[in-house]
Amino acid sequence: MLNKFLISLGIWVLRLISLLPMPLTRALGTGMGLIAYALMSKRRHIGMVNLNLCFPEKSLAEKQRILRQHFAELFIIGLDYGLLFGASKFRMRRLIKYRGFANFEKYYKQRPIVLLAPHFIGLDIGGNRTTMDISGYTMFSEQRNQYLSERVKQARTRFMIHNGGEIFSRQDGLRTIVKKMKQNKLP
C-alpha cells in the first residue's frame, strides 16, 4: 500500500514538473544530476570503468566531463518522464519533432516494418510520440513492482490505443510482435 502511494506521489510530482518551461526542467535535472554524480560513488565508479573500457585514449578530465554530462542527462530525462504520464497530444507534438519521417512513411505504407531502437535515454518518450501518428506494436520491460509496471504500461499506451497499437512485454520476445503483425496485417 505504501509502495502504491509513493509511486503515485512520484508520478504526480513528475507530472507537475512536466508543466514547467523546458529550460527550467533542464536546469533542475542538470542540478540533480550533478548532485547525484557527487554522491553516488558506486554508480560513478561503474560509469568510469565503462568509459575506460570504451575510450582508453580519452583523458581522465574528458571522461569525467562525459560522465557528469551523462548524470545530468539521466536526471533531465527522468524529470521529462512526467510528459509520458500527462502531457497533451498538442504539447507532445510541439516538443518532439521527427527528422526523416518521410523516409519511414514511404516504406511503412508498402509493407510491415520492424523498427529496432537501442534503449538509450528518452526512448519511451519518442516512442510515445510516434504512436500518435502510426499504428504498431511496441515492447516494454516489466518492472519489479507490478503497480509501477502497470502505470508505465498505461502511460506508454495512452495514445496508441486510439490507432490499433498494442504493447507487449519484452519477456515475450520479438517473435510475438512479428506474429501479431502477420495476423493483423498491420504494418
Q: For each predicted feature, which ranges?
A:
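Soluble catalytic domains of membrane acyltransferases
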Residues: 85-187
